[in-house]
A protein has these predicted regions:
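Short hydrophobic beta-strand that contains or immediately precedes a catalytic carboxylate
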Residues: 14-19
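Domain-scale recognition of functional cores that engage charged ligands
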Residues: 4-9, 24-174
């Protein structure tokens, strides 16, 4: 969730958006949790690891793809021209450590093969499982970049969307 607050006592929080489609909060929380633990030097004080969000996150990704016949997970992110601080890249980079067989790709390097009616990466490797850190509402409205084709042109050739299209109804700002 993204909120704003006026700072005036008694004023309510205002909800700006619900980030159901691009859930980076768990990644950010795991990093903050681990960083805080290290900075406080809790291990030197005899405390075991405090909080296990990151470990649980990693283990769940491994469970999800353990039984996959095509376990490659493509992690799509926007390029530097859209995200100059590379926040999205860094988030998918962290997910890459959780899943076992991953490939990070800029979303503009997802290619539609007219002959096979399927999606692939720039190396020609088929995309069967895709996590994209790019809002669905932008995909469906961005005909200039061609990203909208991911949804409308042979959407079914990608077997597993980690964050499926129905999530756009929860997070849509249009």
């Amino acid at each position: 969730f993204d909120f704003t607050y006026s700072g005036i006592p008694g004023d309510p929080l205002k909800l700006l958006e619900y980030n159901a489609d691009t859930p980076t909060g768990i990644i950010e929380a795991a990093i903050c949790q681990k960083t805080w633990y290290q900075q406080q030097r809790l291990d030197a004080q005899g405390y075991g690891h405090w909080g296990e969000i990151g470990e649980a996150f990693t283990e769940r990704w491994r469970q999800i793809f353990a039984a996959e016949t095509t376990p490659q997970l493509h992690l799509a992110h926007v390029n530097e021209s859209i995200d100059p601080y590379q926040e999205d890249y860094n988030n998918v980079w962290l997910i890459a450590h959780a899943a076992q067989l991953t490939k990070l790709i800029p979303i503009d390097e997802i290619i539609f093969n007219e002959d096979t009616k399927s999606w692939s990466d720039a190396d020609g490797k088929p995309i069967n499982n895709l996590f994209k850190l790019y809002p669905w509402e932008d995909l469906v409205t961005d005909s200039e970049s061609g990203y909208d084709k991911l949804l409308f042109a042979y959407h079914g050739s990608i077997r597993r969307w980690v964050e499926p299209a129905w999530k756009m109804f929860l997070s849509n700002k249009l």
